[in-house]
């Protein structure tokens, strides 16, 4: 590996955009979290069933600056 590749390499961003999905209805939304944090699980209002339900992180979408 050349030394120029190491010097010109960009640093990884601190935050990433992730896709959250409802465990009940499949409703999805995006959320920002830190790269080093654990996968997200949270309770939030689901507009499809009109109740609070569990949302889990499904996948990473992209990194943010």
UniProtKB/Swiss-Prot annotation:
GO terms for biological process: translation. The keyword Mitochondrion applies. It is found in: Mitochondrion. The keyword Ribonucleoprotein applies. GO terms for molecular function: structural constituent of ribosome. Keywords: Mitochondrion, Ribonucleoprotein, Ribosomal protein, Transit peptide. Coiled coil: none annotated. Its main location: mitochondrion. GO terms for cellular component: mitochondrial large ribosomal subunit; mitochondrion. Component of the mitochondrial ribosome large subunit (39S) which comprises a 16S rRNA and about 50 distinct proteins. PANTHER family: 39S RIBOSOMAL PROTEIN L33, MITOCHONDRIAL, LARGE RIBOSOMAL SUBUNIT PROTEIN BL33M. Belongs to the bacterial ribosomal protein bL33 family. This is Large ribosomal subunit protein bL33m.
